[in-house]
């Protein structure tokens, strides 16, 4: 696994530990709707508590332009306290004398949560002075926010210049499973890539085409490949000006014996009228058709590939699963992946912005797969081989 400093063998007794997590979670009317990211942070928090540390938790939430009560992390405190089975005190700021006073007063094994980091514009500016003020609160820094580690923000990368810095358990798990999935020795390895904008995923597609045996494409990304193959896609969504990029993906896939799998049949709506749902062969798509899901023949092909695979990576939905008439492809493939995982035949790693929603739509949970990543953009960045400032900053601790 990637060599980064971790907290397991650190003497943290009596030390103030600044723990960066990602509590940017769905909240409606002040109530947490999906606590997955909070749950993922618990092993690290419990380890710090048991080690006798003073735990100071920091996170961002949403994209505030200024202080906004609707984007306050106070909305997370109750859920965190309940899941941790321990009182968590909330502080309505993240830097300054008031925060320092609270930190000075906390005892070992206490846990406090500071206010939204993004209430200060300096967080996203990777401002050194802001990072230094955060660092002044603690003796040690721990990054447990893989899902933010692709960003060069003050609490992710700059802060490591001022404190001894380590990786938490969630971040380590993310890296371990992602590395395992793309370097799996047993074959075949399959990647499923869906979603809308192909330009944001080209680097990932090229990297995957070098490593996997099957590259299964869905969503608007598949539309682009159909169009590239001179297949009419009607009024379906696609991205212009990417043919040269698609050519690169195809060329690299051919060189590495990677089979690109695109739909053979599709479910369409006419003129984006979602109340119509018609099955067509891809070569029979009409000018007013909008492709919104895969058809049964494509589903059968993908299911057979998954059933024969030893490892699988999945990023992005296969169809417009938010609409029940066009959710079948995503849901049924999810179920096949889950079934193969439960039988011990498949190592499955799933990630990306819509992953948890798609898993929920299939009536499944993250326990039905080997690993479900908390990262959206970070998952994409890692698979694309991009430098991740948060990870690079931790690696620099070893130099």
Curated annotation (Swiss-Prot):
Can you list the disulfide-bonded cysteine pairs?
A: none
From the Swiss-Prot or TrEMBL record, state where the protein is found: Cytoplasm
Q: What GO annotations for molecular function exist for this entry?
A: ADP binding; ATP binding; phosphoglycerate kinase activity
GO biological process terms, semicolon-separated: gluconeogenesis; glycolytic process
Quick one: which residues bind ATP? 201, 322, 352-355
> What is the similarity comment for this entry?
Belongs to the phosphoglycerate kinase family.
Catalytic reactions on record:
(2R)-3-phosphoglycerate + ATP = (2R)-3-phospho-glyceroyl phosphate + ADP
Which species does this protein come from?
A: Wolbachia sp. subsp. Brugia malayi (strain TRS)
Recorded protein name is Phosphoglycerate kinase
